[in-house]
Amino acid sequence: INIFNDGIESVYMLPNDAGRTAAYYRNGLIHFFITSAIADLALLAVSATGDEALSQFHNEALRLRDMFKYEFFFEGSSAFIVLLEHELEQRAPNWRDSVKQGAKATRKLLAGITPILGHGTLRPFIEAYLVLARALRMQPVGEISDQKHLINHALTLGKQRVLQKRIHCEESVSGSYFENAIKIVCETLKKIPNR
């Protein structure tokens, strides 16, 4: 940690080359909130009623878990759902009733949960994935084999997006986040028929 003492108060900062170390400690702390953060976002996917609404919630939570699997360590699918429900039970004891009533009741439930963790916990990762997606769209078709070039392009684009205030977290402009986003893209492309 560097300390700047020349101003009216001390400012503590990480050296520019300490990004991976900081990410390790940050992710260690975020790990305590990640399941609840995923629950917050998964609640937004509910549009049906009854058991179908619960299925939508679970499926979205599992989809998000899969999307962040290179950032965090998760339990297996069944154990994750049990943990997800337990975490939500702690914050909103009657959540199942609200979810089964559909989208409107679920949004009302979400508005009453404090603190909401999804946006603050997951924003840097989602913004990084969006920057990488934009960088991919800017590449000529068939020319994404050079990952280092793509990551450098995403870093430049990310810096631009921060300066334009189109993304909120400077932390999102991260080579390691972009590397993980590329892994997700490659997995997704393998699932598309005729590729």
Where are the model-predicted features located?
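Membrane-interfacial terminal anchoring regions of lipid-handling membrane enzymes
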Residues: 1-195
